[in-house]
Amino acid sequence: ESPWQGGYLSGIIGKWHRGSHPVNHPLNRGFNEFYGHLGGGHRYFPELLTDRDIFEPMSDYESYFTYIVRDHQTVETDQYLTDEFSDEAVDFLKRNQDKPFFLFLSYNAPHLPLEATEEYLSRFNHIEDPKRRTYAAMVSAVDDGVGELLATLDELGIEDDTIIFFLSDNGGVSKKNASNNKPLRGQKGDIWEGGFRVPMAARWPSAFKAGIVYDLPVISLDIFATIAGLNNAPANQGRPLDGVNLVPFVNGEDTGVPHEAIYLRKYDQQRYAIRYHDYKLVIPKLNAKPQLYELSEDIGETNNIANAHPEKLEQLDKMLKEWTSELQDPAFLGLTHSDAWIKKRNKQK
């Protein structure tokens, strides 16, 4: 909501996954435009879409078959989903080139189900595994789309005034779609490094030198803090941000670390972790004994050193418990409201 309050026209294209209740609709959460789907995944070919009621599905999988939505109205589509979102994003840039804008382009690809057009599949005939081949094709479609966006910004002459962040939302699902997170341990949904540690790229010719590689850990919450910092948005002392403005760190003006500690929680499965500098404490499941790893020497998290460093284990465990004590239970998980939210609502009636 902050960019909207700062005079920006804001739009989201693609996957929303912030709840399907009308109160959680993007247009009720600060966005001016929405084109996409409410659930966490979707079918890629328009002939597979059968449900016009976007609020009827009660599970993420059921929502995969809903029609695409423009603002509040379902629309007929005739393109491969990734190409559809790319074209919409290019159109958004052209329509709003003369005004401040914020665009959240949330590609569904390469999320399951594995579906790609022959145009993209034909680029990877050398890959024998059909899952891996389709996965590569889906990523290639995203690559083409991002290339179109960058070219459009250049053609419109607004590339120097536009900051771009590109990242994934989680690690690959190696057991289902042949993605590969090696040398990291784990996959999507895990609190091992393979579950959440992903690359992030940024482009802003006015400030970032091309080719810079920044190795210290950052988090997706830094994106909001960076945008707020660039807009000189006043800080809300009652609601401090978890993220930081990355510009001085990336440009070398600040030689410290953006985050001394990074905290992780998989609420619905009671998985927790904290990374403090190069040490990482992991609680892989409810009531499990904490494990300790030294990531600079063991990026694959294979050697549990908890018994050898009890003082470090105790320090990180205390920090993690203090952090979790400040958290609220999530209001919804995926498409629908969580049990905790429903119980709280019923008590208030």
Regions found by a protein language model. Give the residues of each.
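Formylglycine-dependent sulfatase
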Residues: 1-291, 295-325, 329-349
